[in-house]
Design a protein with these regions (language model features):
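The feature marks the mature, well-folded catalytic cores of soluble enzymes
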Residues: 2-418
Length: 418
């Protein structure tokens, strides 16, 4: 049995969405994001195709902010390190190939260096153009590229001192589960949990899982996270003396509502970013239920709530919302489409998000958040700790076209308790 020796001393500990960030997992978008065409982009879960050169420039300052203020781990680096262990390498390659019906590649991949294997597990392994001309022309990759890997939040979620390996709704992302399970089990040495090991029909994704505090999860129920997945989370934490889960139903269309963090994120102890129709139960959210699940001594009670803010009040959160897109519905819909509600907290009251959503940034400014540029923070000209509340904005026109924002692209590993 393999005993991986290069574990880090950093422990998984995330008990809120806003505690000061001490460590984070990122993935720099690579050539995998261009290995699609308009005809098969939908198979990659994209609604458009991206330009890597532009993405590189946009992501540079995004990750630069994190490198300036916290410990950053990169998926590709950790994967390459894990693959240096022969047993782990064999296991990961075997599982990856079995999942995609190409077991015949195992021996060939095992002959390569850890760096090359990591590259092919992420960027894809092509059919031979001469040997498989039809398949090469139709699909090109026998091991599909991990087009969505830079959305590190989706496939895994730090939940307190454990990591939830999310049971993805689409097969194109299954290999991400295998990679994250290996990373968190062997590199970080933490317990991993998986809804599908409890029920094969259960699905969860990280964009739908938000940690309010040590006794509260907020969960989105929609096209990616289903009722069985929520039942698994309730079951997992039902042994605690008291625990609460707030469930917000999400529309299945359009694609911008795939996760809860596309319409709601925590900004501070008493502030949140929200898509206003979710609060008012209008437009796309008409008829979408909000439920407070109260677990007390193993007994479970269900309470219907008017909206998420009311549900949060029941569990001791008196939140003041800042509305994505300001106060005009058309602008709200435009900016929500490009992840205008999707902010990531670096510390209480200090968040990062897209600059392009100008009406949302103006609303934050009016709510007392100083508006900072990622370029200045990344290069050390501005310190977020000089401000009580701030929003770090980074320029992006290409990244939002992939369908996610700052929270989607970050997997927190360790935060201060608050």
């Amino acid at each position: 049995m393999s005993i991986f020796k290069n574990k880090t001393n950093i422990k998984v500990n995330v008990s809120s969405e806003i505690g000061r960030l001490n460590a984070v997992l990122l993935h720099r978008p690579g050539v995998e994001i261009e290995r699609m065409t308009p005809l098969n982009a939908h198979e990659a879960l994209y609604s458009d195709i991206l330009n890597k050169n532009i993405v590189d420039n946009e992501y540079r300052y995004f990750c630069g902010v994190f490198e300036r203020i916290t410990k950053v781990f990169y998926v590709s680096d950790l994967l390459e390190e894990l693959l240096e262990d022969d047993d782990l390498c064999n296991s990961l390659i075997t599982q990856s190939c079995a999942a995609e019906g190409c077991e015949y590649l195992v021996d060939e991949l095992m002959q390569q260096s850890p760096k090359d294997i990591a590259k092919e597990l992420i960027e894809g392994f092509p059919y031979r153009k001469g040997k498989d001309p039809e398949r090469y022309a139709e699909r090109r990759y026998v091991l599909r590229p991990l087009y969505n890997l830079f959305f590190t939040r989706d496939a895994s979620s730090s939940v307190y001192d454990r990591v939830l390996i999310n049971s993805m709704s689409f097969d194109v992302r299954k290999r991400e589960n295998l990679i994250y399970k290996a990373i968190f089990k062997h590199y970080f040495g933490c317990e991993v949990i998986n809804a599908q090991e409890w029920n094969s029909k259960a699905h969860t994704e990280g964009g739908d899982v938000q940690i309010g505090r040590s006794d509260l999860l907020c969960i989105g129920e929609g096209i990616r996270t289903d009722a069985k997945g929520i039942e698994f989370l309730a079951h997992t934490f039902s042994n605690r003396p008291k625990f609460n889960i707030i469930v917000q139903q999400l529309p299945h269309q359009p694609d911008s509502f795939i996760h809860l963090d596309m319409v709601y994120t925590f900004l501070d102890r008493d502030r949140c970013m929200m898509y206003e129709p979710m609060l008012r139960k209008t437009a796309e959210f008409a008829g979408k239920a909000t439920t407070w699940i109260e677990i007390d001594g193993g007994k479970v009670k269900y309470h219907d709530c008017k909206n998420m803010l009311e549900a949060l009040k029941h569990v001791g959160f008196d939140m003041e919302p800042v509305f994505c897109g300001g106060d005009d519905l058309w602008v709200q819909q435009r900016e929500q489409w490009h992840s205008g509600a999707n902010f990531f907290a670096l510390a209480p009251g200090k968040v990062i998000g897209y600059r392009r959503n100008s009406h949302t940034i103006d609303a934050l400014d009016k709510a007392g958040f100083a508006v900072l540029n990622a370029e200045d923070v990344a290069e050390g000209r501005t310190n977020i700790d000089d401000y009580n509340r701030c929003v770090v904005t980074f320029a992006a026109s290409e990244l939002p076209r992939a369908g996610g924002g700052a929270r989607c692209m970050t997997m927190p590993i360790n935060r201060d308790n608050i």
